[in-house]
């Protein structure tokens, strides 16, 4: 089983149930945010350049709380989610896209 969200560049990004369980295992505070992971890919406030070719979709939750979803676009028609987490830190030097 899996769900798919479309990135800001129009690339379908997969979230398998196995990957979701892995994410929740390492970030239990994200456990109730399955739909928000997909929504963050589809409607981010901004996207950051991550490490080793990854992208990070970001949604703001409150004044200094950000929801980060790390993903990789393998091709123009395929990608997958790596992890998701909350943070209070945001490195604005790596912004590649911002919601208009």
Stretches with model-predicted labels:
Residues 1-100:
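Ribonuclease/tRNase effector modules and their secretory precursors
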């Amino acid at each position: 089983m899996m769900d798919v969200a479309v990135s800001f560049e129009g690339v379908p990004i997969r979230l398998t149930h196995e990957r979701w369980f892995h994410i929740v295992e390492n970030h239990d505070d994200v456990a109730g945010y399955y739909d928000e992971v997909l929504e963050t890919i589809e409607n981010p406030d901004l996207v950051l350049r991550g490490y080793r070719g990854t992208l990070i979709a970001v949604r703001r939750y409150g004044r200094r709380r950000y929801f980060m979803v790390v993903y990789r676009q393998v091709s123009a028609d395929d990608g997958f989610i790596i992890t998701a987490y909350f943070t209070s830190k945001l490195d604005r030097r790596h912004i590649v896209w911002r919601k208009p």
